[in-house]
């Protein structure tokens, strides 16, 4: 699809193109479905997809009636799956207006196990639903049916009057009626008696906790974790994560499958495989289950008097369509469970200080479960999967936001490139020098047409073809300033086929009427690889059948003449270059580029940037001084040198009197030791968080009593990173502490505290174990504007706090899910936790606070509900506390994992050492003894590394070397042995050019450290050396005599290999110039520090196609005793 881009925002143009594509794709979906219905068994899937893909959005091969009939068929289908039954009720009388064929048998069948109580109920049109179920069930059902957000109560446990059998009733509203799906409760299944997400969450608690604990920055790791957790939670044979690309085609990006199943990882499939109508339904119903694709579907019988058709789109029992069923059967998938992953539109801006408008949503992808035999998943577990998918979607959204931030950085980089290009010989410099226009956006080729001459880079059409494209653009796109397309063939360029696969997509912009810049991309299929299993020799797929392999084949056929689409941010960069060049070429025949104006512009930008930085700095100082949270600071001696307005107000001690006093004289006696320890650690660089202590009050504030603070200590450092003081960011928790103290003393009179109108009582609300609001104190009523009577006995999640029709509206779905996680953690018995929380009060004001959730226990220790305290600190403090808590948790988990690994390695290592010692007592040959010696030295090296408890000592040069005699031969041989497996794996030949006399040299020093260093640099060299090449290690030994008996040995090790060598960024990490070093870079940094402890250093040299590490150390020559 070609796009001529006028001057408009990227978001609007992108959304417009997406809407156009959806409309066109829906027509294509309708035609594929029509072909299938008409052709029956002779339906040729691959050719159908291929033909429909050639139809653009403006040209429909069939009438609109086909599309209309298709959408009606999707939305108004009257068939259900037989694993349950369905009733439709009039929403006013609760009488049956439609029912499935199997409903009478399932709901009114007599069971001999239940005593007969008279006439059996008859189920039909007009039946009162209350006559079918037991009295308690009918009462519960009617109560739910009168509920506004009825879906929040699903599932509702009911029992049939005649058989006594239990069913889950799953209710949803449609226009004019209520649809109820009834699913039998299996005998092995413990029925869920409570409604809503609170109970279902417990089923997915482990999976949610694992997702929540993942570090950000890796979409692949997130997807792999999600499919693994769903695989374990649901028990399906195969679980996959599907991602929809910008052109609506899909890809399997993660997969877990039982042994013996062929993998589908890496598979791509056309957009028609999951029609747009189905995607729309996934946006409405986040979880979809097919129990048995071979089962016979049942009809829904509707009251003939109804003036409208019922829609079953929201039904859990809705039958899949025949085309999809055949696809499933062809891939040997009899049952499936699909979860929608819905994220925010990437181009939406959410602005406004209070409650932001709801973001537009899009279907990012699906989590799909397949089973080779029929499989039924109870509704509570499906509900848990839906909740898990929402948590997953939040994390996907965060990863996408992180990617967008990277894109924004790339845009800034392109702006720098633009300026760099224009500071030189523009416009020729943008193609003749480096960086050039191919560095601006990802492309396979680029060209400049300037003054009837052509400059080409990479894969491009030839000069004649480029002039032909320019002529075609002038003729057919003369009104536009350029064109971007992922298919010149689809855009209508007559010579597209002659260009072949190398040139499919193009972005072109005009500089002047006659001058243009082009970027070209090759076809998408060249970048697509299916990671699935390949065929055995002689096996073939029937391309006519709907199957993943034929989908993949069809997809490759579709994209043969199509490139990767041009991203909006890429086109923004291209248009930026176009606008700058056009402004400098107002008269191309008589003028050159005005460099001075560009330099002036750049200079103005720098001045603005400096002024903005100074303004930000001043604003930060002002914010600290006027912050609504207490902030204080001390110098190295513990004397106050910072005391902001808020701390002065709380304590009654003005700034001028506080400055110069020792911090310990200002705190209560009971807190002196706590503060002394915190201060001592902070001055050592160890910053403590969330430390609670009491500080004295002065003057008129003495009567109030001491102030309770929770403090985060931060070390102040100078330019050389030396600690010069400590500043403390505090939170006043005096009011909360008073309440908690009272609560502790008066547990038996809980209501007297909570309902006390005293302004010191913070806002408190609570819930029982079933999720109904059971507490709402006066402070909460005042804060929200909703009285106790208006919220008690409403569903806390959904009715009281929710996204749509609720008392206190939350910001978005992400906030709703996060609140559910926090509350459910308390219901699961976890310790109290605090979380950022925000909602819209009745008066329209957005309230931001900290939520503290505490579980309520009965006398037996069982959780019977929870209550929540709200704290209302500043927004800055909320964010700071949250970030600190997450960092602390991550650091603690990593520390525990490291401790676990170190501990678990010790046992097998001890076993290896013991086995080696046993072997040493046996009769061994010379070579065998040498191997044992090498093994022993490797084991000692492992033990040495495992015993490291403080890496900072190595970095700071404060460790002691363990000196002993050794030969250079044994150190080199042990070091080389540690990389031999990798060397053989890459087919590298290693050559040791160390002279024999040097090998036999006896030295005095820390052999294990030298061995560790050499092995590390050998490993990194092997990693970046080309396969099949050669790696050489040579040693130069130089002796210097110090006195009569001491010789100083200078060793130079040179590790050389062919190729460009290791990346520059890794070298920077080795020399300590990068703050966030990778694992490789940190290891090299430690090795270099160890070398410097041995009076040496490390250099890296690139020369004549070779790269070398040069490691120098100074050791003493060992004294050789002579016998006479």
Swiss-Prot record:
Residues forming the PAS domain are: 616-686, 749-820
| InterPro entries in alphabetical order | GAF, GAF-like_dom_sf, HATPase_C_sf, His_kinase_dom, HisK_dim/P_dom, PAS, PAS-like_dom_sf, PAS_2
Keyword set includes Transport: no
Cystine pairings recorded for this chain = none
Q: Per UniProt, where does phytochromobilin bind?
A: 323
Please give the biological process terms from Gene Ontology that the record holds.
detection of visible light; red, far-red light phototransduction; regulation of DNA-templated transcription
Task: Please give one Gene Ontology molecular function term for this protein.
Answer: photoreceptor activity
Q: PROSITE patterns, alphabetically?
A: HIS_KIN (PS50109), PAS (PS50112), PHYTOCHROME_1 (PS00245), PHYTOCHROME_2 (PS50046)
> Which keywords does UniProt give here?
Chromophore, Photoreceptor protein, Receptor, Repeat, Sensory transduction, Transcription, Transcription regulation
**Superkingdom of source:** Eukaryota
PTM comment text: Contains one covalently linked phytochromobilin chromophore.
Pfam families the UniProt entry points to: GAF, HATPase_c, PAS, PAS_2, PHY
* Residue ranges occupied by any Histidine kinase domain in the UniProt entry: 900-1119
Compositionally biased spans, kind Low complexity = 1-14
Complexes and interactors? Homodimer.
Among PANTHER family, the record links this protein to: OS08G0260000 PROTEIN (PTHR47876), PHYTOCHROME 1 (PTHR47876:SF3)
Q: Into which family does the record put it?
A: Belongs to the phytochrome family.
Purpose of the protein: Regulatory photoreceptor which exists in two forms that are reversibly interconvertible by light: the Pr form that absorbs maximally in the red region of the spectrum and the Pfr form that absorbs maximally in the far-red region. Photoconversion of Pr to Pfr induces an array of morphogenic responses, whereas reconversion of Pfr to Pr cancels the induction of those responses. Pfr controls the expression of a number of nuclear genes including those encoding the small subunit of ribulose-bisphosphate carboxylase, chlorophyll A/B binding protein, protochlorophyllide reductase, rRNA, etc.
**Protein name according to UniProt:** Phytochrome A
Organism for this UniProt entry: Cucurbita pepo (Vegetable marrow)
Question: Could you read off the lineage of the organism from its UniProt record?
Answer: Eukaryota, Viridiplantae, Streptophyta, Embryophyta, Tracheophyta
Gene that encodes it:
PHYA
